[in-house]
Amino acid sequence: MKQIHVIDSHTGGEPTRLVMKGFPQLHGRSMAEQRDELRELHDRWRRACLLEPRGNDVLVGALYCPPVSADATCGVIFFNNAGYLNMCGHGTIGLVASLQHLGLIAPGVHKIDTPVGQVSATLHEDGAITVANVPSYRYRQHVAVNVPGHGVVHGDIAWGGNWFFLVAEHGQRIELDNREVLTEYTWAMLKALEAQGITGENGAPIDHVELFADDPNADSRNFVMCPGKAYDRSPCGTGTSAKLACLAADGTLAEGQTWVQASITGSQFHGRYERDGERIRPFITGRAHMTADSTLLIDEQDPFAWGI
């Protein structure tokens, strides 16, 4: 019987399953190499951890790893029901909160190695967590995509740790009771982007769509479609970073000014940025709450031992 020790949390409603031990040892010299090794040689562990019958489509996984940098607290690899993520803002907040829950870290600044570079996270005395994300930028502005059944939609392409297509004018009602319509609309948009060869820089696939609307209690409300056809319950850390990059490029948000980003569930992240050459360094603040400390069991006689 194989065992996987996990800590479950949620950040603004979006769950993170942190794997503390039980996965195969990885040997890559960088987190990107270790992610590729996990994907190519040990992907069944991701499936066992996140897919039914132990998981669900909404879960985001985070594998706790030894750091590859001398000054880092740890390394991390993020994954979901469909595959692997470059970076995850809500997951980083969940990671830090979980490590505090386990007594492994104290308030202060903690550097974390990820497949797309090192980020830092500040655990504040009151439990809030601020992630200094990877340098972010807008790649293209006002890009047209023809979405079957919906016509031409325009959006910006931006990097915030993942590639996003950000749409402000869409004619959709961003409310929780409209989530099924929003899911089908944004999924059709993702498929249209792929079919029409619209990508991030150097041909990188765009795997997130972010819609925006007004919110009476925040600067904006969003709906974020993630790879795997699950919507983000949180305001999305990498998505908020991509939004900050667009606001900075438009000159509509000053350096250091706070942007309050609400999600479709009503949870909020507070974001700001600093200039970093031609890019920006986003700072995303939120909170995570623990939901479980448990052991997943894998019985290899189980026909669904490695997921459905």
Swiss-Prot record:
Keywords: Isomerase. Substrate binds at G89, H90, H208, D232, G237, T238. It catalyses: trans-4-hydroxy-L-proline = cis-4-hydroxy-D-proline. The active site is at C88, C236. Its EC number is 5.1.1.8. SUPFAM superfamilies: Diaminopimelate epimerase-like (SSF54506). The keyword Isomerase applies. Coiled coil: none annotated. InterPro entries: Pro_racemase_fam. Catalyzes the epimerization of trans-4-hydroxy-L-proline (t4LHyp) to cis-4-hydroxy-D-proline (c4DHyp). Is likely involved in a degradation pathway that converts t4LHyp to alpha-ketoglutarate. Can also catalyze the epimerization of trans-3-hydroxy-L-proline (t3LHyp) to cis-3-hydroxy-D-proline (c3DHyp), albeit with 200-fold lower efficiency. NCBIfam families: PRK13970.1. Belongs to the proline racemase family. This is 4-hydroxyproline 2-epimerase. It comes from Pseudomonas putida (strain ATCC 700007 / DSM 6899 / JCM 31910 / BCRC 17059 / LMG 24140 / F1).
